[in-house]
Amino acid sequence: MAGLILRKEEFFPSATQAVAVADRYPQNVFAEHTHEFCELVLVWRGNGLHVLNDRPWRITRGDLFYIRAEDKHSYASVNDLVLQNIIYCPERLQLNFDWAGAIPGLFGTPWKPHWRMGSTGMAQARQVISQLEHECARRDAQGNAMAELLFAQLALTLQRHRYATDDPAATQREALLDKLLAALAASLSRPFVLERFCEQEGGSERALRQQFRQQTGMTINHYLRQLRICHAQYLLQHTERLIGDIAMQCGFEDSNYFSVVFSREIGMSPGQWRQRSRAAA
């Protein structure tokens, strides 16, 4: 059975249009698919499971993905997940601009799909996307040209403000919530103490907990546990490490407790997941 392929004609009104904006307010569960076009995915709020080329990512506010046409991905376990897809056809781009320099993986350049954006960059990107959406709706030559200019501006804005998911140093000028998300991503294998984090950053623990839940739809502990489970899934599928070693690498000192948590979240034991994921690959 052939996989689901999203076709250009379903999303681009004309054969000359290079860029379009696909809103997902909210993003529902979506089966695995590929595309005849590329896309940028920026998450505004809520949470969900994004599986990209068989690798699971627990996504929430500020997550940014660069998706190539051949990449297969899906969305599951969504909870008020709000995101925008900026879709584009590389072969239709006319503007003399270094697209490959700004967009990882384009035209065979090194591909790193997953990044994060802080509040400052997200606010700037939102303004550009709003203008881009307006121009795409015009459906004329001037609108197409303006849309391409704005897409170049967006690509540069994302390039300027994106940072590695586990790089807390990159968030020093960002809001406290952005710093927290980066600190959590850098704590997959070691304990994270919110009280200590708030002391270091001079923030209110109670206020930060409330803000985190409001923006992501999860508690801080739940989000960190989901990050660790996703990382464990990846290691189980792609390495030969013992389950006990993987448990330690994912922040679980007790392998039995790891197995209990993993089974509760995934619906099968770590060993069963390893066997099933490899059989499906």
Curated annotation (Swiss-Prot):
Q: Which InterPro entries match?
A: AraC-bd, Homeodomain-like_sf, HTH-like, HTH_AraC, HTH_AraC-typ_CS, RhaR_RhaS-like_N, RmlC-like_jellyroll, Tscrpt_act_RhaR
The subunit structure is:
Binds DNA as a dimer.
Q: Which Pfam families match?
A: AraC_binding, HTH_18
Q: Which gene encodes it?
A: rhaR
**Key word Cell cycle present in the record?**
no
Task: Give the source's domain of life in one word.
Answer: Bacteria
GO CC, one annotated term: cytoplasm
Q: Which residues cross the membrane?
A: none
Entries under PANTHER family matching the protein: ARAC-FAMILY TRANSCRIPTIONAL REGULATOR (PTHR43280), HTH-TYPE TRANSCRIPTIONAL ACTIVATOR RHAR (PTHR43280:SF13)
Compartments reported by the entry: Cytoplasm
DNA-binding region, residue range(s): 195-216, 243-266
Keywords of the record, alphabetical order, are: Activator, Cytoplasm, DNA-binding, Repeat, Rhamnose metabolism, Transcription, Transcription regulation
Q: Name one GO molecular function term.
A: DNA-binding transcription factor activity
Q: Can you say what this protein is called?
A: HTH-type transcriptional activator RhaR
List, alphabetically, the SUPFAM superfamilies matched.
Answer: Homeodomain-like, Regulatory protein AraC
- Site Interaction with sigma-70: which residues? D245
What does this gene product do? Activates expression of the rhaSR operon in response to L-rhamnose.
All copies of domain HTH araC/xylS-type, residue ranges:
178-276
Species of the source: Klebsiella pneumoniae subsp. pneumoniae (strain ATCC 700721 / MGH 78578)
Task: Name its GO BP terms in alphabetical order.
Answer: positive regulation of DNA-templated transcription; rhamnose metabolic process
